[in-house]
Amino acid sequence: MSIFNTKRMQLLGMTISAVLLLNNPLSADTSEAKKPFSEYLQECPWIGLIANQITYGPITISDVNIHDGDKLAFASPGETLNGMLKYKVDSKDLDSLHLYHLVIGIKKEGAQDCITHNLGMWNSKGHGHFSLKAPEKPGIYEVRFLFTEGLTCARAREAWNSGNEKPSAAATIGIIIVE
């Protein structure tokens, strides 16, 4: 049996490509895991489905890699995780001459990195790199993104961290398991 199967699902009329985890998490290294991945999957079965491509508002995120793996990473408390992703911004619904930022962070922990900027006048695409600090408390955490307006990256991160704007579950692009 393979370590993962790709399935196509119909959800509210939209086709999404998802990865179903079976015995191992995608291409993440589980040799250092403190318990079998199947136990994590039993505790939180939702971590078995992570979309390969996510469109959230005017931005599409794809090809997410966290910590030299795929969309799932095991980490020690406080460990720095590096990742990369591809993005595509459709500017047709953005305000012209407004500055927008793609921010990456961890649910309930806050925004941690800013990947790219867009002026709102042109479509853009590319790939970006990011760093995340794993939470200090062991657990299962969602990596999310927010595409928001702000004069600087610091202000865009503050929009998330202050609670004024928070990415929904639809903006989940990865999972970090802190052991």
Language-model features: where?
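Bacterial N-terminal signal peptides that target proteins for export
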Residues: 2-12
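Short proline/glycine- and polar residue-rich coil/turn motifs
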Residues: 118-126, 135
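Short beta-strand elements
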Residues: 151-179
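Structural beta-strand segments of beta-rich domains
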Residues: 77-83
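Bacterial N-terminal signal peptides
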Residues: 13-23
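Short, surface-exposed loop/turn segments at beta-strand-coil junctions that are enriched for proline
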Residues: 131-139
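Aromatic/hydrophobic beta-strand junction motif of beta-rich domains
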Residues: 83-91
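Short, compositionally biased P/S/T/A/G/V-rich stretches that sit at domain boundaries
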Residues: 29-77, 177-179
